[in-house]
From Swiss-Prot:
NCBIfam families: PPR. GO terms for molecular function: RNA binding. This is Pentatricopeptide repeat-containing protein At3g20730. Keywords: Repeat. InterPro entries: E_motif, Pentatricopeptide_rpt, PPR_At4g14850-like_plant, TPR-like_helical_dom_sf. One of its GO terms (biological process) is RNA modification. PPR repeats lie at residues 12-46, 47-77, 78-112, 113-147, 148-178, 179-213, 214-248, 249-279, 280-315, 316-351, 352-382, 383-417, 418-448, 454-484. Belongs to the PPR family. PCMP-E subfamily.
Length: 565
């Protein structure tokens, strides 16, 4: 419905105000400009009430330019005018403008009051501007607002948000009386800085002093419960919230579902979710993520996703990304394609880096390399994981040359590879026998990029060298990493198997000795060593190794036999 503006009706400020209220209900920017122009024509724009309402509506429309012009035309601007404008900027989220206006106010030598400080400190907090906030704190201490509850509360909120909990606690302890905002800011600050125990202690003190918590308090405490992974605390907080009358709060239910999922109780999370009439995006996302991490619960995740589509619940890229990860886990590229198609048709879903990476990963791990490449090339922005996922996909499916080409392109575009990128490349080299190039890549990782080799990297390079018969070189690498990186039994097993195939008795004994110290009851270790001895004609040693296997109490292995006799 459009607002009809006529000069015959807009004859007084009160009628202009009524017309502006209609604009605020209908969010009509065009009509707002029309009424503003009409008020100027008829000489009513100097009316302060009308001007204030115009400023508010312009800011709600995101039109900072017109709002600021109106403010600049106020002839006599006192502390009330400045504070009102700073407060509007802060309340509407225009925090840089609020800070800029506060500085102008200071230059014009207008003294701030507690409401000015409260608003500008809120902007500092939301922007994370600790330096500016501390400067304003200095002005507070010099003035007469230092003991004001609003100002103290704003200061501790700023320090808590910026991780300065000691300074926040000083403000908190110096307050003669504390409101709920102050308690919540402290509890949330401790939670955000991983001081969960202090959050719980402060909550106990809050209850002791007779302060009633709200949904925000419970939200912070539930996040603290996630930090310590304590299901018992989540249940206790749930019970207390119901007792205090917050059991039906949708915000609290969201927090509880998330906490139950992350503390390992999918059953309680599901029960809460099922009890709500309206499906909530955050709750659904938390449940889908939780179910995706349980191998036997993937069907439940699909049920929730289908339920969201049926009930037309708002969808986002996080949900779609989680569903694609499930498709990757269960190797269902068919369902993955359907979800991809749904995402393409939806106007709600933004194809961000995380979603693009999930698509690359799903298609690459399912062997659909062409689709993985298409998803990669269509991404507007890519991170190191995007490149690494496709490199790993090429390597996994034997496209070694393309993996190297993509790595070279990555280097050319100055995307810094990480340890997983090099692990994918080394794995590809190992499986395709590209020993020389693999060694060069390993050297690049260590000396050019300064990435320390993990056990997985060493396992790849040792396996690659050993497969190609470079047993001495592989063992030299093992020796050089003694005391730095502990090799797994699977790495030693691969090395022993390579030694056996290449008939190197001496290094077979070294590998077998290491394996037997790690897994003394595993028969395959004895059998491999005995096979090496037998292949080299050392029958006595082979027999002794078999005896050792029996004496160790290893699981019995059925003896080999022939049908020819």
């Amino acid at each position: 419905m459009m607002l009809v503006v006529s000069e015959n009706y807009l004859l007084s400020p009160s009628l202009y105000l009524k017309a502006l209220k209609l604009c605020s209900y209908q969010n009509v920017k065009k009509q707002l400009l029309l009424i503003h122009g009409n008020s100027i024509t008829n000489g009513f724009c100097s009316n302060l009430q009308l001007k204030d309402m115009l400023i508010d509506l312009y800011l709600k429309q995101g039109d900072v330019k017109h709002a600021r012009k109106l403010f600049d035309r106020i002839s006599k601007r006192d502390v009330v005018s400045w504070t009102a404008m700073i407060s509007r900027f802060s309340r509407c989220g225009y925090h840089p403008d609020a800070l800029l206006l506060f500085k102008e106010m200071h230059r014009e030598d207008v003294k701030a009051n507690q409401f000015t400080y409260g608003s500008v400190l809120k902007s500092c907090k939301d922007l994370g501007c600790l330096k500016e906030g501390m400067q304003i704190h200095g002005s507070v201490e010099k003035g007469n607002c230092a003991g004001n509850l609003i100002v103290r509360s704003a200061l501790l909120s700023l320090y808590a948000r910026c991780g300065k909990m000691e300074e926040a606690r000083l403000q908190f302890d110096s307050m003669k009386e504390r409101d709920l905002v102050s308690w919540n800011a402290m509890i949330d600050g401790y939670t955000a800085n991983a001081c969960a125990d202090t959050s719980f202690s402060l909550f106990q003190l809050m209850l002791t002093e007779g302060k009633k918590p709200d949904c925000f308090t419970f939200g912070s405490l539930l996040r603290a419960s996630i930090v310590v992974k304590c299901l018992e605390i989540v249940s206790e907080l749930h019970g207390l919230a119901i007792k205090l009358g917050f059991g039906r709060s949708s915000a609290l239910i969201r927090s509880l579902v998330n906490a139950y999922v992350k503390c390992g109780s999918l059953a309680n999370a599901w029960k809460l979710h099922e009890g709500t009439k309206k499906r909530d995006l955050l709750s659904c996302t938390a449940l889908i993520t939780g179910f995706s991490q349980q191998n036997n619960c993937t069907s439940d995740a699909f049920d929730i996703f289908k339920d969201m589509i049926r009930m037309k619940t708002k969808m986002d890229e996080v949900v779609v990304s989680s569903m694609l990860k499930i498709c990757t886990t269960i190797a269902s590229v068919t369902i993955g394609r359907q979800i991809h198609g749904f995402a393409l048709k939806s106007s709600q879903i933004r194809f961000d880096v995380a979603l693009g990476n999930s698509l690359i990963d799903m298609y690459a791990k399912s062997g659909e390399i062409e689709d993985a490449v298409l998803a990669f090339e269509e991404m507007k922005e890519k991170d190191v994981r995007s490149w690494t996922s496709l490199i790993a996909g090429y390597g996994r499916h034997g496209n070694f040359e393309k993996a190297i080409d993509l790595y070279n392109r990555m280097e050319h575009e100055r995307i810094k590879p990480n340890d997983v990128t090099f692990l994918s490349l080394l794995s590809a080299c190992s499986h395709t026998g590209q020993t020389e190039l693999g060694w060069k890549i390993y050297d690049t990782m260590i000396n050019k990029h300064g990435i320390e080799a993990r056990e997985e990297h060493l396992s790849c390079i040792i396996d690659m060298l050993a497969r190609s018969g470079y047993l001495e070189e592989a063992y030299a690498l093992i020796r050089s990493k003694e005391g730095i990186v502990s090799l797994s039994s699977s790495t030693w097993g691969a090395f022993l198997d390579a030694c056996r195939r290449h008939g190197n008795v001496q290094l077979s004994k070294v590998a077998a000795t290491q394996l037997l110290s790690m897994e003394p009851r595993k028969p395959v270790n004895y059998i491999n060593l005995a096979s090496v001895y037998a292949a080299n004609g050392a029958w006595d040693n082979a027999l002794n190794t078999r005896k050792l296997m029996k004496e160790s109490g290893s699981c019995n292995k059925a003896p080999g036999y022939s049908l020819v006799y």
